[in-house]
């Protein structure tokens, strides 16, 4: 079923005749591939003067860099992403592998990144997902907002539960800067969304190991759901400010059904 999907085409870049995505910026590769019409602000060194002499129309040469789209895929490695008794960790890895495979089917190059105290490339991430090393969800505390310099005009996807403190814009601004498209997938376990009402629980903070005994009555459950909805709205608003897509998914539903209609509706994916 997963093979039905390819990455959606970024709205910020037109579709080329070769079936890949063309950036509006001039590339630096020496390998010439195609033309497009001149636009104000284009590098004059890339104008095809021979074509202009023949047609009296200004055109710009496109190079391989401009027609090789790229996916930057960030996976949150916080301890909360591997919630005990849930499928969240497995779903995060499965989604990462799915996006990498969809990128390959779409003619994209891809770089998987591990997000924690720093944002670093996954060792062996250039290989097929089946050959990736195991993911380790061991980071404690907030993830770094100091992101690397991603490839210009890349498609960017973040997979995280977003259980971070602070203003979402502190992360989402550098994440979306210069991207062809940016998508934030909030991956939650069912237990993250619906606390077990009417039960007494022994909770262990995944970040600090602090232990707390609590009873979840109807009032506490409603307070939790309201706080989660407020947190999600903060992230939704931040994403909208920078032109990113925000999508919540439930880990158990992803693994059981692979229903990705929400990603297709948001044009993050397309059906081949």
Residue map of PLM features:
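Exposed, interaction-prone extracellular/peripheral surfaces
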Residues: 1-24, 36-45, 51, 60-272
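Glycine/proline-rich, flexible active-site/cofactor-binding loop segments
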Residues: 27
